[in-house]
């Protein structure tokens, strides 16, 4: 009967000549097994450190991106020590789509791609954009685990051009933290003033809805008298109307409305 004692087997293997093919194969297998185990153990031990390193890199990249958005640097600096996150939102449902790198998503490219974009019903297209992407990025800022601010990309037709900007909301999802436009070609000296700090500074603290939750944000002619009204620019009524319409579109059912609703009722962890 064969001796199955491992010590006996080991002694027998060691007694083989070094030129023995069997001994060479066994030694090679043992070395490979030992090295593989060492690598696996090291990887497991280093994984928490690697994850922390990747998270620091992601936060730094996110902060750099958000601070590069026109008018957003002060909002981020003012928020203090926050955790930043970019998520990709399915606009129709408001659900967050899991992707490897949401920061690399090109919303304009998808909106222009007939294989991927969405035709907005004419009756709902108050922003005058015709088509939109099916997905859009949203930037979340958290402090101590609670949602502090959210930044949303917006666009829509003005008087003479397409207006591109970002709307920032406070964590209550009703109060405007800021509005900035980074691209437009409106009438010089009139509509172009939507990019001036003096006008953009009118937005923080305004409300997007009334006490009943109805979406009411608007740019009015003259002075605004309601919490959801912002002073218009003299001589740029049509541009102001365009701003009103694009904000209501992107905050509504065909924009980020479903996503904001999911955040509000807690179906998405803010």
Question: Where are the regions that the model predicts?
Answer:
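N-terminal intrinsically disordered, acidic low-complexity segments at the extreme N-terminus
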Residues: 1-6
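Flexible, solvent-exposed loop/hinge segments and secondary-structure transition points
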Residues: 8-270
């Amino acid at each position: 009967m064969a001796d199955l004692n491992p010590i006996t087997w080991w002694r027998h293997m060691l007694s083989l000549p070094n030129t023995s093919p069997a001994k060479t194969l066994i030694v090679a297998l043992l070395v490979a097994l030992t090295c593989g185990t060492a690598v696996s153990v090291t990887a497991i031990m280093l994984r928490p450190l690697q994850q922390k390193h990747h998270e620091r890199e992601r936060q730094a990249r996110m902060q750099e991106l958000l601070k590069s958005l026109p008018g957003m640097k002060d909002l981020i600096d003012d928020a203090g020590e926050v955790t930043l996150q970019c998520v990709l939102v399915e606009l129709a449902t408001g659900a967050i789509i899991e992707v490897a790198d949401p920061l690399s998503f090109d919303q304009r490219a998808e909106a222009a791609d007939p294989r991927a974009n969405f035709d907005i019903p004419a009756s709902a297209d108050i922003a005058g954009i015709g088509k939109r992407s099916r997905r859009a990025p949203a930037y979340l800022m958290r402090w101590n685990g609670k949602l502090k601010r959210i930044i949303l990309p917006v666009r829509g037709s003005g008087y003479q051009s397409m207006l591109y900007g970002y709307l920032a909301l406070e964590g209550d999802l009703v109060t405007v933290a800021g509005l900035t436009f980074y691209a437009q070609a409106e009438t010089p000296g009139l509509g172009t003033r939507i990019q001036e700090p003096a006008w953009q500074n009118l937005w923080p603290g305004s409300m997007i809805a009334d006490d009943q939750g109805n979406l009411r944000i608007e740019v009015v002619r003259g002075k605004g008298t309601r919490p959801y009204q912002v002073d218009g620019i003299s001589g740029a009524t049509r541009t102001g109307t365009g701003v009103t319409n694009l904000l209501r579109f992107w905050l509504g059912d065909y924009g980020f409305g479903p996503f904001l609703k999911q955040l509000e009722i807690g179906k998405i962890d803010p």
